[in-house]
Regions:
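Loop-helix junctions at membrane interfaces
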Residues: 1-159
């Protein structure tokens, strides 16, 4: 029940923060879902982390705050983040899982979806770049948050 409550709070936080972007050169990145994926991977594990990513993507799409590309990216990133954290028991592994899962694998899976939705071919490198910029920034923020919580002995990790 505790994990469900934590995941639910993070879903609400993810929906609210999805309206916030950070300008990086000519682009705008949206790193907060990635931050939440890393934090949930460590705190609640893979099932609740992926469930929260899916729930956040659903709500963002229903509220017109996101795109269908959010599903594969966030869910793959959440799963790989939690998987690598469980395997290596290290916060850096969770951050790396989010970057690889969303930035690379999520972008590759989203490529045919993006082409279908746009009705014209899109450069794969464009998706990888945009997904990677957001996931690297979010994974770094999540890593820092988890390090601070850990150093203050406030982090209760998934067993």
């Amino acid at each position: 029940m505790k994990k469900l409550i934590i995941a639910s709070i993070c879903v609400a936080l993810g929906v609210v923060l999805s309206t916030t972007s950070i300008p990086v050169g000519p682009a705008r990145i949206f790193p907060f879902q990635h931050m939440i994926n890393v934090i949930l991977a460590v705190i609640v594990g893979p099932r609740f982390s992926v469930g929260a990513a899916c729930s956040t993507s659903c709500l963002r799409n229903v509220l017109a705050l996101g795109s269908p590309l959010a599903f594969p990216g966030s869910m793959i990133g959440a799963w790989l983040s939690a998987y690598l954290y469980k395997k290596y028991n290290a916060i850096w592994a969770a951050a790396l899982g989010e970057i690889i899962g969303t930035g690379l694998i999520g972008a590759l899976v989203s490529y045919p979806i993006a082409n279908f939705l746009l009705g014209k071919p899109l450069a794969l490198l464009t998706l990888i770049t945009s997904f990677s910029m957001s996931s690297v920034a979010g994974a770094c923020i999540g890593f820092v948050v988890l390090q601070i919580l850990s150093r203050r002995h406030l982090l209760h990790k998934e067993a």
